[in-house]
């Protein structure tokens, strides 16, 4: 089957579902009222400590790898970028509007004029206000992609490879130093970094074998587990422990990319097709948008699922896993409902409003024909 993105590969669609589950698992601990690094070290403590960073960073890397794999071999235009951003903005508008209504219903007298002023700004300008950092970075990346793609292709294999090595040295090797930032993180720089690496692999290198993918995955997982166990045993200050663990688990770190790339290659090699998986995977982004919308996020992790309520329970790990899956199921169902409403209304002529607006601008600004 051609990997043109037109026919969804169920292996990668299943990986999207796994990615968003990992992100929700990370948020359950990261947004909780417990500092898991300050708890007595045991198997349960290790489990929650491992959830604190790594799963979420693996999840966003998987989301990005799946997207850029197909974008690397597609023509990129400014018009195409704006169209994708337009379609994405409608979903952001929906979730922000739903959150605004929920806030007014749950606490009609509790909203100050200051809070409501920000709520309206968030409603219409979610990208510029960075409500969802991943979506904002992705939108910026799409706008830059035509220029990045053209220049990478013009570089050729040798110069592209040198660029990869420089990036790996700056952000993979030096990134292991505790406290290092190097201007990369939850921003578009990470997106460009991953695109440069994955495009080089797609254009110039042979595909790795399943055995190699398993080895890469195992190495990445082993490094993270060993780092957490070893550092927890020798460092007893919670703040210092976080500082030394983070370089191994933060976004775009070597272990995170090893795990993500290994999983990506393993699931990409899956040949089977499933309409059910493909359908459910359409809600993966929606699950992320719902659970990370600021108001819904606060409700989820401070009122609905409070880690401190069951952390000391005998079956805390089981409760955590059940709550993660339950949140994903509910959020996924809500997004499928949103998708159904869109099909009845906005998507009856998908992109028609954008095309009309673009054509109107085209009639007034002729230079847009080059985009």
Can you say where each PLM-predicted feature lies in the sequence?
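Alpha-helical transmembrane segments and their immediate juxtamembrane cytosolic regions
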Residues: 1-371
